[in-house]
C-alpha cells in the first residue's frame, strides 16, 4: 500500500501556491513569517503535516475547512 496520496499532495501544493500568489507573497516571505518551507511543499518535495497546514491557513486568513473545499472524494481517499 502506498504511503502517499500523490494526487492529494499535488492538489494541496497547487492550492497553497495559488493562495500565496493571490496575496502577492514570495516563498521567502511565507517562510520568514511561518518558518515553513512552502517552496518544498509547492514542488512536491515535502509532505505537509496537519500542524503546518493549520499554521499556513491561519497565515493566509482562511480556515482548514475553506482550504479543503474542492477536494473530491477520490482525492481524499
Language-model segment annotations:
Residues 22-40:
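Short alpha-helical DNA-recognition segment
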Residues 1-22:
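A short, Lys/Arg-rich alpha-helix, primarily the initiator
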Residues 17, 26-28, 54, 65:
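Residues within the helices of the helix-turn-helix
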Residues 61-77:
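Short C-terminal boundary/hinge segments that cap the last helix of small helical domains
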Residues 43:
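Short, conserved catalytic or interaction motifs in soluble domains
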Residues 49-66:
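DNA major-groove recognition helix of helix-turn-helix/homeodomain DNA-binding modules
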Amino acid at each position: 500500500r502506498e504511503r502517499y496520496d500523490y494526487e492529494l499532495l499535488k492538489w494541496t501544493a497547487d492550492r497553497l501556491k495559488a493562495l500565496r500568489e493571490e496575496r502577492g507573497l514570495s516563498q521567502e516571505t511565507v517562510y520568514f513569517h511561518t518558518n515553513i518551507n512552502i517552496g518544498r511543499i509547492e514542488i512536491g518535495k515535502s509532505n505537509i503535516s496537519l500542524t503546518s497546514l493549520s499554521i499556513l491557513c491561519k497565515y493566509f486568513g482562511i480556515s482548514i475547512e475553506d482550504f479543503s473545499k474542492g477536494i473530491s472524494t477520490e482525492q481524499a481517499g
